[in-house]
Amino acid sequence: RMGDYRFSHSVNVAKEAKKLAKHYGADENKAEIAGILHDITKEMPKEQQLQIIIDSGIILDNVQLHAPKLWHGMSGSIVVRDELGIDDEDILNAIRYHTTGRAGMSLLEKVIFTADFTSEAYIQRCGNNEKEI
């Protein structure tokens, strides 16, 4: 389901998440699992992501409906639960909210949110595009 770049990014996020979890006292195992799986549906066709969300009963607000780049967090948490059998709410919520954040985020949610933007691959990619930024 993941291309080479996405897999490498996810491995880096998992490593960063584990380090952050250790530093801040979050569950390192959960952080590593959520980190490796956070983008599981990112490369899935948008129509398929939307169908997964709709089939699960999630009702998208107007902003979410018109922001398909946000869908992979929601669809990813559903796929992880339904296809991989992971039912840990901390892990599922960390995946679901890793792009948007939310009020009252748990420590694990904050760890994954932060790790996604501070992982080595992400920083290197931004550095390679710094003229565009």
Where are the regions that the model predicts?
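Short, Lys/Arg-rich amphipathic segments at extreme N-termini
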Residues: 1-19
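Divalent metal-dependent catalytic cores for phosphoryl transfer on phosphate-bearing substrates
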Residues: 1, 20-133
